[in-house]
């Protein structure tokens, strides 16, 4: 047997390298067979895009869309040409719906107060609360949702409220048409949503109403407005826009007036006064002239005119627009 002096540096490095390589060889992942589906849906080809017709909600309204998916993952959204709210086109909100699915900051778990919780903890806490709510017939139980457009979800919420008759359901939308609905209730005695027929109009008076801008009906209203302008049918569609700041509607208006928000109500009252043959309220000279001209056009185009009021205006102004 060789002595210690025969154990040179090169041999020592060989033994050290072998000792390091052996544990590293066992760190690899075990061989696994990866398959896209255990039971593949009928008619689906892996890696091939498939389109589905669906509905995207915005502000309580549904917009028809066609969504392309690959292996069940949405990758592209298009407008549904058969749906009156999209007509084959999309807006920025529809495109953002796809991006939101892959947002790294999207919530992945429920929260309890300021801490991240788990779904198991949520289910356990909910089970206890529902048991206590049953004894009180739902008193103290509140459900907060956005505006629901799904018939299935509305039916499920209805079943929940039947089971807990003392529970309360609250609906909140950051941007909604609540003022417009309340205005229609004041004017007609019941809540209604106005759907203007722009394609048949000869005159539009928009008071802080950007119907060509972002909103649930942007695509349909913009398409109808463009088609009406392109039709060589007398009388030519005329658009008045009165607004406190710039908008797409104001940029396309024949007559645009920048007016302080506090004077919009007086302008609508001035139009109504001219139609009634009464003295209008005080307004700046430019606003007074526009109110007089708009009233004359409304009278000349009776039955073919539309008066729109923006969603952020009070219900009283919406009710006055219905009267006009």
Language-model segments: what does each one mean?
Residues 304, 309-323:
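Acidic catalytic cores of enzymes that act on phosphate-bearing nucleotides/polynucleotides
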Residues 140, 303-304:
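Residues that mark the start of a beta-strand
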Residues 290-293, 304:
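Residue-level detector of intrinsically disordered, flexible termini
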